[in-house]
Amino acid sequence: MTSPATNKSAAYDYLIKLLLIGDSGVGKSCLLLRFSEDSFTPSFITTIGIDFKIRTIELEGKRIKLQIWDTAGQERFRTITTAYYRGAMGILLVYDVTDEKSFGNIRNWIRNIEQHATDSVNKMLIGNKCDMAEKKVVDSSRGKSLADEYGIKFLETSAKNSINVEEAFISLAKDIKKRMIDTPNEQPQVVQPGTNLGANNNKKKACC
């Protein structure tokens, strides 16, 4: 059973930092908005640099504070965004099931993780916009096969129709919580939201 926090400053048992990465336009910001506020915007949100939201959930009798960072997919922001990989405890790699190129680039994003994140970071592959079945070009079996190749979990989601969004974030949080219990000396490295790295959003076109 999960529920949004009524008081963001309330006590919590675990603080977990998650990171959303993937090409521009795959719907990372929409996934974050759906999970954190249970809302959806039909406008495409271009993240400038990096942005974050917080949601506290109840998970297996513990209060888990999720600090979720949304990164820009554009190459010109890569230096800024890769700086946040090191502190991530979990990373969601997002592609658009209607965009073959975004799926092909997942291997590049995984290489970025291998170069900049900790070895123990939990990962999950997300095929977003699964509600657009008539435009789908990346079959579910291909997503599952790629995830299996890297030994990570896979889900198809729709931020627009709220399909598997909750499940994706909660599943990753559960895996991280288990790892923290199994390795009690591991402390989360949390990037504090002190400096605004251009987190303002520009709205352009449709996103799911």
Swiss-Prot record:
Q: Name one GO molecular function term.
A: GTPase activating protein binding
Q: Which PROSITE patterns match?
A: RAB
Single Gene Ontology BP term?
regulation of endocytosis by exocyst localization
Q: Residue ranges under compositional bias (Polar residues)?
A: 186-201
The record's annotation in CDD domains points to: Rab8_Rab10_Rab13_like
Principal subcellular localisation of the protein: membrane
What GO CC annotations are associated with the protein? Answer: contractile vacuolar membrane; contractile vacuole; lipid droplet; membrane; pathogen-containing vacuole; plasma membrane
Quote the subcellular location field of this record. Cell membrane
Alphabetized UniProt keyword annotations: Cell membrane, GTP-binding, Lipoprotein, Membrane, Nucleotide-binding, Prenylation, Protein transport, Transport
Q: How does it sit in the membrane?
A: Lipid-anchor
Covalent lipid adducts (S-geranylgeranyl cysteine), residues: 207-208
Q: Does the keyword GTP-binding apply?
A: yes
Q: What family does the database annotate?
A: Belongs to the small GTPase superfamily. Rab family.
Record NCBIfam families: small_GTP
Could you tell me what this protein does?
Protein transport. Probably involved in vesicular traffic.
This protein is called: Ras-related protein Rab-8A
UniProt source species = Dictyostelium discoideum (Social amoeba)
The protein's gene is named rab8A
